[in-house]
From Swiss-Prot:
Protein keywords: Cyanelle, Plastid
Keyword Lipid biosynthesis on entry: no
Keyword Plastid: yes
Source superkingdom: Eukaryota
Subcellular location: Plastid, Cyanelle
Main location: plastid
Full protein name: Uncharacterized protein ycf35
PANTHER family: YCF35
GO cellular component: cyanelle
Family: Belongs to the ycf35 family.
Amino acid sequence: MSHLTQVQTNIVNEEALKKALNALNIKWQDGPQNIKNLYGQEQTVDILIKQKNNFDIGFVKEELEYKLIADLQYWEQPYTVETFLQQLKQQYAYQIILDETINKGFEKLEEEYDKDGSIRLVVQRWRY
């Protein structure tokens, strides 16, 4: 049966979420915008990801965290929901770490994406 599902993400930082979506080459739009299911049930989202089948997905901030909102029956992304969330959370964590290290005076020297999917980040801070 078609219905909109909310999936907990533990994502709290909007800018890091948007950077993570960009890093995954996922096109998104700022909300508020509505998404709907087959029966016309609608929900307003803060970040919208359009799908070719017009059953868009999005993120809505509830209390302190963003939740993924989607009609999973009409999921049309290159990965499964689980893989999508895994990759999104990895990129989100990477963005949080990178932003925090830059705020503390470090600069990124290099990053490597390993075959196992892990990311190696090298940062440095000069002391005078």
